[in-house]
């Protein structure tokens, strides 16, 4: 069995300012997305320029942070938000919802499309290959924070989280790092390396993420304040991923 290494969540300090690993991972994700986007524009000679790319990353960053935090409080911790609404601003403590962030990015992309006259699916197809590595960085942030641990297990790589209990658990943050981050990146990046009908890359991302999340959630301990939310075995993350999967299937079929 393994033991959680109890990593200091603070990466470094600048005087009174404490820089947390979790926030640093988001910064790495956004910078990485810009670099990947820049490479795609140059390599594939896409009809994008650097100003559009920078604006898209800026809009998306706002959508991810605002949507992710609001989504977490609404989907996962609504009672805490009602009683202590100021916790909404404590982003450094963790507590971000991918699905809320996705909705935030959808709104941001809509505003971006209005500004630059691009279609929604064109923007979706461009940004989809840039997302998974950011997701990977976020899951590493979850691991460093010692949050979102897995269910009790007897597998040899089970990890004991001393701040939780003395039972070995699935290191589910690392599973999600591998699935939503590395595997999904390889899938989307390779698929998007050739010209595809508009909407296909977006559809593959929606389906791919939903499937990865549905699998990973089966190893992850449900949020203590929620437990299972449907049928005694579905988690909130799985419930929110099902519409993604259905929309992805529909879009894939519509763009066949």
From Swiss-Prot:
Any one GO BP annotation for this protein:
lipoprotein biosynthetic process
> What InterPro entries does UniProt report for this protein, alphabetically?
Lgt
Q: What is its EC number?
A: 2.5.1.145
Does the keyword field hold Cell cycle? Answer: no
**Does the keyword Cell inner membrane feature in the UniProt annotation?**
yes
Where does the chain cross the membrane?
19-39, 56-76, 91-111, 231-251
Which leading EC class covers this enzyme? transferase
Q: Which GO terms describe its molecular function?
A: phosphatidylglycerol-prolipoprotein diacylglyceryl transferase activity
For this UniProt record, give its keywords in alphabetical order, as a comma-separated list. Answer: Cell inner membrane, Cell membrane, Membrane, Transferase, Transmembrane, Transmembrane helix
Q: What does this protein do?
A: Catalyzes the transfer of the diacylglyceryl group from phosphatidylglycerol to the sulfhydryl group of the N-terminal cysteine of a prolipoprotein, the first step in the formation of mature lipoproteins.
- Its protein name is Phosphatidylglycerol--prolipoprotein diacylglyceryl transferase
Tell me what organism the protein belongs to.
Legionella pneumophila subsp. pneumophila (strain Philadelphia 1 / ATCC 33152 / DSM 7513)
């Amino acid at each position: 069995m393994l033991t959680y290494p109890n990593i200091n969540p603070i990466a470094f300090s600048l005087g009174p300012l404490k820089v947390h690993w979790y926030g640093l991972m988001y910064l790495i994700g956004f910078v990485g997305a810009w670099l990947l986007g820049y490479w795609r524009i140059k390599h594939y000679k896409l009809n994008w320029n650097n100003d559009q790319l920078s604006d898209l990353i800026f809009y998306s960053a706002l959508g991810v942070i605002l949507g992710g935090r609001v989504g977490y409080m609404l989907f996962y911790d609504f009672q805490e938000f009602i009683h202590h609404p100021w916790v909404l601003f404590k982003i450094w403590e963790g507590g971000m919802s991918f699905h809320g962030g996705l909705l935030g990015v959808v709104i941001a992309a809509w505003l971006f499309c209005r500004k630059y006259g691009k279609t929604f699916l064109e923007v979706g197809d461009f940004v989809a290959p840039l997302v998974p590595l950011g997701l990977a960085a976020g899951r590493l942030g979850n691991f460093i924070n010692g949050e979102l641990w897995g269910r009790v297990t007897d597998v040899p790589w089970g990890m004991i989280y001393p701040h939780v209990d003395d039972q070995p658990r699935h290191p589910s943050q690392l599973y999600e790092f591998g699935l939503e981050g590395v595997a999904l990146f390889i899938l989307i990046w390779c698929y998007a390396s050739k010209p595809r009908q508009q909407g296909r890359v977006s559809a593959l991302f929606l389906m791919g993420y939903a499937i990865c999340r549905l699998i990973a959630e089966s190893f992850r301990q449900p949020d203590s304040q929620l437990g299972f939310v449907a049928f005694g075995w579905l988690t909130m993350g799985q419930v929110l991923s099902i519409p993604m999967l259905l929309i992805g299937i529909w879009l894939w079929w519509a763009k066949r």
